[in-house]
């Protein structure tokens, strides 16, 4: 049974919305950082503490 793509997309959107609502600075990248982020092969690259990361909290299980 292969994972369905729409389900993964919905999960990603929920995670992104969660970060926006919780007020974390996950998406606060400068334009220069955004260029660096695109070099990584990430599904959801973003910045956290001025560092480029994959997912920003999603892979860590949302535990802060």
UniProtKB/Swiss-Prot annotation:
Expressed by the venom gland. Its main location: secreted. Contains 4 disulfide bonds. Residues 1-23 form the signal peptide. GO terms for molecular function: toxin activity. It is found in: Secreted. The keyword Signal applies. GO terms for cellular component: extracellular region. Keywords: Disulfide bond, Secreted, Signal, Toxin. Belongs to the scoloptoxin-14 family. This is U-scoloptoxin(14)-Er1a.
């Amino acid at each position: 049974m292969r994972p369905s793509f729409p389900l993964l997309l919905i999960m990603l959107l929920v995670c992104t919305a969660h970060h926006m609502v919780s007020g974390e600075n996950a998406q606060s990248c400068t334009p220069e950082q955004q260029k660096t982020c695109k070099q990584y092969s990430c599904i959801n690259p973003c910045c956290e503490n001025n560092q480029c990361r994959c997912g920003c909290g999603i892979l860590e299980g949302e535990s802060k």
